[in-house]
């Protein structure tokens, strides 16, 4: 059975940031300036710890449950995680509720589809 | 009025009505998705408020018996005595007023309470739009002075454009305006709006001949020409700076349409080319100036309609060709028309800005123009309408 070519073992992490949609350009720029170009961006809806936002609509209280957010996913080597997190925090923060969250997740391996090359 | 003329004005009325949601779509594409419904809704609200006020007293104070050249009387209130052709004219003019208020919503994009907008638009129609309509079209002091405004360079575009600047300065910038780039959420929606506007403008300018005649034909031809020339100018500017974005191209076309509006029944095609060319340049520079000065007149009613209408109104005094409609401008040996146009432009510009500033500050003080920061964050679709544009 043919084995796919492999590379050296590099600890990888996925940094997942859920941010305000309007902060996407700032975050992209901050990451690019630090040399992190690759990313996956998804439009999502979500809610944080405060569950939702209560607003008075037409004389009655309504909970706005899920708000429009943007999810940015970046896969980097373990030693670059702190720099990526710092870049996202500094560029996405407004100081108000709803600035978002960052999660750091271990990545087992990555396969480049064009070449079949693996990173583990 | 012949049956053909009646048919053309009926059709033109429908064309101008379609421009109202056209403005809504044009603007909605340029805001964030959480405010798209609100921008379109504001255009329909503009139409509804205008229809009601126009019937009650708006038409009368615009076109009723002249009182000292300043305002019309209440002799046509609730359309009493308005019949036949006058009823058709009333309806046609109603749509102009509605479009003008819809244009003004540029200034409050993504941050105004609907209730406050209703109050402001009612006051604005009464104290800015109606006087302008009377001054220029209802036998008021500017008409007596000899100033010309074929289809609304001053009545519609200067009024809404300079009012938008005043309202934007009163309501303040959108949250995050200086922190990050607020991007359009749907360029196709804006392009649909632009298509409706260009289409409707044939009724806006062509219908202002108030007959299906040679002046109407000329108006439609020069309207189309100016739009294309100004759109081309913005396309070239886009190429010089990078790529010719569709948003820029249609914004340029709208600038050309705004600029030709006061002149459509007075200039020939050569004049229209000049008007479109200059409009493309000056409106772009105005937009650039607004951005550099960090003024959040969000969707550029001032730069495109205000400055476009101002230039077009001055251009009438220079380029009016007597072969088109009997009126001669500076280039055809009549400097007096330019003097009249300059007086009219100066007075309408100053009045629109200052009176709107007073009205906006009064509404803000009384009920508050702006939604809460939390409502702005959630978006106006949810906080003002309990709806979303896209699920």
Swiss-Prot record, chain A:
Biological process annotations from GO: regulation of nitrogen utilization
Keywords recorded for this protein, A-Z: ATP-binding, Cytoplasm, Nucleotide-binding
Pfam families in alphabetical order: P-II
Residues reported to bind ATP: 40, 48-50, 75, 98-101
Residues reported in the UniProt entry to bind ADP: 40, 48-50, 75, 98-101
Compartments reported by the entry: Cytoplasm
Family matches, as SMART domains: P-II
Cellular compartments per GO CC: cytosol
GO molecular function, one term: ATP binding
Domain of life, source organism: Archaea
Family: Belongs to the P(II) protein family.
Subunit-structure text: Homotrimer. Interacts and forms a complex with Amt1.
Record function comment: Involved in the regulation of nitrogen metabolism. Regulates the activity of its targets by protein-protein interaction in response to the nitrogen status of the cell. Regulates the activity of the ammonia channel Amt1 via direct interaction.
Protein name as catalogued: Nitrogen regulatory protein GlnK1
Native species: Archaeoglobus fulgidus (strain ATCC 49558 / DSM 4304 / JCM 9628 / NBRC 100126 / VC-16)
UniProtKB/Swiss-Prot annotation, chain B:
Subunit and interaction comment: Homotrimer.
GO CC terms in record: plasma membrane
MF-aspect GO terms: ammonium channel activity
Matches recorded under NCBIfam families: amt
Localisation per UniProt entry: Cell membrane
Biological role: Involved in the uptake of ammonium/ammonia (NH(4)(+)/NH(3)). Transport is electrogenic. Transport the ammonium and methylammonium cation with high specificity.
Key word DNA-binding present: no
Protein name as annotated: Ammonium transporter Amt1
Classification via InterPro entries: Ammonium/urea_transptr, Ammonium_transpt, NH4_transpt_AmtB-like_dom
This protein's UniProt keywords: Ammonia transport, Cell membrane, Membrane, Transmembrane, Transmembrane helix, Transport
């Amino acid at each position: 059975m043919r084995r796919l070519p492999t590379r050296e073992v590099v600890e990888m992490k996925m940094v997942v940031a859920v941010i305000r949609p309007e902060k996407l350009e700032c975050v992209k720029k901050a990451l690019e300036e630090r040399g992190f170009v690759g990313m996956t961006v998804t439009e999502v809806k979500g809610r944080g710890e405060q569950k939702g936002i209560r607003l008075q609509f037409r004389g009655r209280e309504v909970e706005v449950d899920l708000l429009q957010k943007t999810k940015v996913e970046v896969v980097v080597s373990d030693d670059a995680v702190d720099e990526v997190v710092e870049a996202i925090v500094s560029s996405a923060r407004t100081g108000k509720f709803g600035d978002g969250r960052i999660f750091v997740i271990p990545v087992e391996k990555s396969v480049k589809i064009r070449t079949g090359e693996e990173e583990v | 009025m012949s049956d053909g003329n009646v048919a053309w004005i009926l059709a033109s009325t429908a064309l101008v009505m379609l421009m109202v949601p056209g403005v809504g779509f044009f603007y909605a594409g340029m805001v964030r998705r959480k405010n798209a419904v609100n921008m379109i809704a504001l255009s329909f609200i503009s139409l509804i408020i205008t229809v009601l006020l126009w019937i009650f007293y708006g038409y009368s104070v615009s076109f009723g018996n002249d009182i000292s050249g300043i305002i019309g009387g209440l002799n046509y209130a609730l359309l009493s005595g308005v019949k036949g052709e006058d009823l058709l004219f009333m309806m046609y003019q109603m749509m102009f007023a509605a479009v003008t208020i819809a244009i003004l919503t540029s200034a409050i994009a993504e941050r105004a309470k609907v209730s406050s907008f209703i109050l402001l638009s009612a006051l604005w129609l009464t104290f800015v739009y109606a006087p302008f309509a009377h001054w220029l079209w209802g036998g008021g002091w500017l008409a007596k002075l000899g100033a010309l405004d074929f289809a609304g360079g001053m009545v519609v575009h200067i009024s809404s454009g300079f009012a938008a600047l005043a309202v934007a300065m009163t309501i303040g910038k959108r949250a995050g305006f200086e922190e990050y780039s607020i991007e359009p959420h749907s360029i196709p929606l804006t392009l649909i709006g632009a298509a409706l506007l260009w289409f409707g403008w044939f009724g806006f300018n062509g219908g202002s001949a108030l007959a299906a005649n040679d002046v109407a034909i000329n108006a439609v031809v020069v309207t189309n020409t100016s739009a294309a020339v100004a759109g081309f100018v913005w396309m070239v500017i886009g190429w010089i700076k990078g790529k010719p974005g569709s948003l820029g191209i249609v914004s340029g076309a709208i600038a050309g349409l705004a600029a030709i509006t006061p002149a459509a029944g007075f200039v020939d095609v050569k004049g229209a080319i000049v008007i479109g060319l200059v409009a493309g340049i000056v409106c772009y520079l105005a937009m650039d100036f607004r951005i550099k000065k960090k003024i959040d007149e969000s969707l550029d009613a001032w730069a495109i309609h205000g400055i476009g209408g101002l230039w077009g109104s001055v251009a009438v005094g220079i380029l009016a060709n007597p072969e088109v409609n009997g009126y001669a401008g500076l280039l055809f040996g009549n400097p007096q028309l330019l003097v009249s146009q300059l007086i009219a432009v100066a007075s309408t510009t100053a009045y629109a800005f200052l009176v709107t500033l007073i009205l906006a500050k009064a509404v803000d003080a009384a009920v508050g123009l702006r939604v809460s920061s939390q409502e702005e964050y959630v978006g106006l679709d949810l906080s003002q309408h309990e709806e979303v544009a896209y699920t």
